[in-house]
Amino acid sequence: MIIIVYLFILIMISLLVYLCTLNTIFCVIIIILTIIFLILLLMSHVKFEINRFDIVRYKIDKNIKIMLMSDMHNREISDRIVKAISEEEPDYIIMSGDMINESIKDTENFIKLLDRIDSDKIYYTFGNHEDELSETDKEEYYKILKKYKINLLNNKSVKLSNNIILSGFDIPYDFYKFMGKKITKKDMSEYLNKCEIDKYNILVAHNPLWNEYYKEFNYDLCLSGHVHGGMVRFPFIGGIFSPDYKFFPKYTKGKYKVGDMTSIVSSGLGYSKRIKMRILNPGEVVIINLLKK
């Protein structure tokens, strides 16, 4: 799929070059538009957003401020994250996966971040890149997380208050679409924790493209990433492409209603080694205020 995207871009560039040879005015317009595009592209890599959502529910018994971050992919972006944490002062920092790439050698910038923040506030669920680590690398990575006292949430639950339950969902790498193994509701039930209906249940699950499954397990709120905002974003259209090699993914960035469940998807902070692309799509962290009604 990504080859098709690049091929399409190459064809369009070739067409524009040909048209420029036919019309000088058209050529000037194309040059101006290209400069604007390059400026916007640069801003996508430099700019950093903080987006906010308030959630007010009867089942929430305590006001809690959460910072959601996802898909750092070991990018050197620590200064901006540390500044955001200092300014926002969240009660909890939730990391919904792919904070590193698929090798223990590709973790240094994430470790630098952990050196600079209050890591015992962090609740972390793995994404496909952590799950792709070799067994040896994964053992080493567990040691790093233990050293920094990270709360690893993979298929576990914790109480944030008397009535707010936070659960993590991690599933074997084989189930990601690019590996070809189709997931079922039965598969989900083996990994998802059971919800207490009278509690406010939050799920941290890397991949929002499975939202239709998550909602069947009575979660009130799902926090995700994975899709990188659709990589390329256009006004009124949204995200174009997902890491699962799918055009126009349904969930890319922001807040969605999926049945009775609310889904909040972070567009992430970086880009993977496989597809180094963010266009009109700056990195972000998300602030979620859980408020008593």
Model-derived regions, located:
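Non-catalytic terminal accessory segments
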Residues: 1-49
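Beta-strand-turn-beta hairpins that frame and shape the catalytic cleft
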Residues: 56-67, 150, 157-168, 197, ...
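Short, Asp-centered acidic motifs that coordinate Mg2+ and/or phosphate
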Residues: 91-92, 123, 150-151, 164, ...
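Conserved beta-sheet core of the metallophosphoesterase superfamily
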Residues: 207-286
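Alpha-helical transmembrane signal-anchor/signal-peptide segments
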Residues: 47-59
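Binuclear metal-dependent hydrolase catalytic cores centered on His/Asp/Glu-rich metal-binding motifs
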Residues: 139, 143-148, 161-201, 211-212, ...
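Membrane-embedded segments
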Residues: 62-153
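Active-site metal-binding loops of divalent metal-dependent hydrolases
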Residues: 70-74, 97-99, 128-130, 156-157, ...
